[in-house]
Amino acid sequence: VEIIANDQGNRTTPSYVAFTDTERLIGDAAKNQVAMNPTNTIFDAKRVQSAVITVPAYFNDSQRQATKDAGTITGLNVLRIINEPTAAAIAYGLDKKSTAGDTHLGGEDFDNRMVSHLAEEFKRARFEELNADLFRLDKGQIQEIVLVGGSTRLLQDFFNGKELNKITITNDKGRMVQEAERYKGKISEQDK
């Protein structure tokens, strides 16, 4: 099989036809002017009657049947349902005996990993930008250290061995103290 390029040098020709006052355009030429001449441009008019539908290799029988049913509902004569890797092998002229592979390794996996990486990079850069003035704080300017919450677990080394304030409060203890103060206030109001 040899695919011959069209007059624009492309191996595919878009299904577009356009009519202007002076000419008829087909393919890329018609597609390129659709925004300026939408009324006189025709596209998406193919009538497919029969189809071989491809599905991801990990689809089970009920998913394959649901896909076939969907095709039938739309009016297609579904000739066959085949796995996407099988379709690719056939397209390359390979005689497929069997297929195997990682069904969860594809473009989306790489996309997700890139998105996660870029989100982390952005968060880190933005975090540093938002807190730049705090990072410039000189350790010598700190008189006492009171840590609350997760910070209570930081090492004293950062502060050159400076003793932590004896009233170090964890999140739980902080909540208890806060509730006790609130409760104490309610009792005082009741005594009045």
Swiss-Prot record:
Q: Locate the residues binding ATP.
A: K46, G150, S151, T152, R153
For this protein, the record's Pfam families field holds: HSP70 (PF00012)
GO BP annotations of the record are:
cell differentiation; spermatogenesis
Is-annotated flag, keyword Flavoprotein? no
Q: What is its main location?
A: cytoplasm
> Which Gene Ontology cellular component terms are annotated?
CatSper complex; cytoplasm; meiotic spindle
In terms of InterPro entries, this protein maps to:
ATPase_NBD, Hsp_70_fam
What does this protein's UniProt record list under function? Molecular chaperone implicated in a wide variety of cellular processes, including protection of the proteome from stress, folding and transport of newly synthesized polypeptides, activation of proteolysis of misfolded proteins and the formation and dissociation of protein complexes. Plays a pivotal role in the protein quality control system, ensuring the correct folding of proteins, the re-folding of misfolded proteins and controlling the targeting of proteins for subsequent degradation. This is achieved through cycles of ATP binding, ATP hydrolysis and ADP release, mediated by co-chaperones.
Protein name according to UniProt? Heat shock-related 70 kDa protein 2
Q: Which organism is it from?
A: Mesocricetus auratus
Name of the gene: HSPA2
